[in-house]
Amino acid sequence: MTETLETPVKIVPRLKTKYAETIKKSLQDEFSYANVNQVPRLVKVVVNMGVGDAAKDSKLIDGAVRDLTLITGQKPQVTKARKSIAQFKLREGMPIGAHATLRGDRMWEFVDRLVSLALPRIRDFRGLNGKQFDGNGNYTFGLTEQVMFHEIDQDSIDRVRGMDITVVTTAKTDDEGRALLKALGFPFKTEN
């Protein structure tokens, strides 16, 4: 009796497919790039959760690590204080936050969930500020609570934590980065 082993089919994230099939071509036409490799693309997404109160209570960092693990799908790295600051009762090496760097398919799936599920769940959401680019096509924005992600059970959170999300692109200018993120579905506020 012989058995055939089936290799698991690799599922490509839908936003990555959309980028490859439609967005790449439209950006190349819009900015008239000579080479397809000049078209801006996503490099990585960094999700950072600062827990300043962890200086007083070190157990708070565990909740941030747990939340970030659920949101990003990978174990975050704990950020430790580089310098001691007496006014904040902070010592060098104390845990003060956590961050996770997403690349590849995890990054595409996170951006898809962020744009299509998490951002629409924010109360009184009017769109992201389009002026928070760094001058090199990278975009950073903050979220005030972690409850908007459907992976987080609203009854099990110990406290509300905000987070910073940085989207790093290969765009050379802010306009190119904004066009890429808008094509990926980021809801920017309309300029009045």
UniProtKB/Swiss-Prot annotation:
GO process annotations (BP):
translation
Instruction: Please give an example of a GO cellular component term from this record.
Output: ribosome
Which GO molecular-function terms appear in the entry?
Answer: rRNA binding; structural constituent of ribosome; tRNA binding
Q: Which InterPro entries match?
A: Ribosomal_uL5 (IPR002132), Ribosomal_uL5_bac-type (IPR020930), Ribosomal_uL5_C (IPR031309), Ribosomal_uL5_dom_sf (IPR022803), Ribosomal_uL5_N (IPR031310)
Does the record carry Ribonucleoprotein as a key word? yes
Q: Which UniProt keywords apply?
A: Ribonucleoprotein, Ribosomal protein, RNA-binding, rRNA-binding, tRNA-binding
Q: Which Pfam families match?
A: Ribosomal_L5, Ribosomal_L5_C
What job does this protein perform? Answer: This is one of the proteins that bind and probably mediate the attachment of the 5S RNA into the large ribosomal subunit, where it forms part of the central protuberance. In the 70S ribosome it contacts protein S13 of the 30S subunit (bridge B1b), connecting the 2 subunits; this bridge is implicated in subunit movement. Contacts the P site tRNA; the 5S rRNA and some of its associated proteins might help stabilize positioning of ribosome-bound tRNAs.
How it assembles, according to the record, is:
Part of the 50S ribosomal subunit; part of the 5S rRNA/L5/L18/L25 subcomplex. Contacts the 5S rRNA and the P site tRNA. Forms a bridge to the 30S subunit in the 70S ribosome.
Spell out the family assignment given in the record's similarity comment.
Belongs to the universal ribosomal protein uL5 family.
Q: Indicate what this protein is called per its UniProt record.
A: Large ribosomal subunit protein uL5
